[in-house]
Amino acid sequence: MTAEVGWKVGGKQGEGIDSTGDIYAIALHRMGYYVFTYRHFMSLIKGGHTNYKIRISNEVVRHHGDDLHVLVAFDQTTIDHNWSELVDGSVVIYDTAAFEAHKPSERNVNLCGVPLTELAKEAGNTIMKNLVAIGVSACINQLDISEFLPVVQDKFGKKGQQVVDMNMVALKLGYDYFESHYDIYFPLPSKHEKIGEHLYASGNQAAGFGALAGGCRMLAAYPITPATEIMYWLIGQLPKHGGIVLQAEDEIAAINMA
């Protein structure tokens, strides 16, 4: 059992990398772990490499860390891009239906092929390969998959119970496949005793909250990555406190409004 675990998922933008990381991070947080996440993305709507890293511990963590124990790769670029972060004996999960993984250099790293797409298809839809990957990760980290149900319910509940059930099936298929084919695990440390006494928030949410608490009551902005999340958060909060959000036609107009 390690004192902390570094986990990352990567692939092309538009493959659901952020939602995969969010579901895993939120579930871990609700289980009582401290998590610090970091998202890497390119200034493109679709395509280009993106990844989502989570540092998991039962103690407070204040940065995303340097070490990586588990990497979920939806393409070879993810392996190449993050190879130097992987620790000795770490695990790389890759989709055998998408590509045949290879090591950029010879190191003690375990390449574990899992038919993520095929298992997702078995669950009902290939788009659920992300939940299969979460199930594989839960197995590697020795987590109880039933604890993911509330998060999956929150994420997909509006689409109906059938969708929730299908995603949980996908998650379990991933867990069971890895458990029956591999014997490599990175169990997480014991959970923190004070479950629920720490918050889960993104840096953008924290920035928006800080602006609101500091007295900001007007935001003029033009939506552009990565600041758009701050704008969206304040759209939902400023009107409750007598404030307003104005979307300008460009950045210069937003500056002039302010």
Which stretches of residues belong to each language-model region?
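Active-site cofactor/cluster-binding pocket
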Residues: M1-G214, M218-A220
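Non-catalytic terminal/interface segments that mediate subunit docking, oligomerization
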Residues: H192-A258
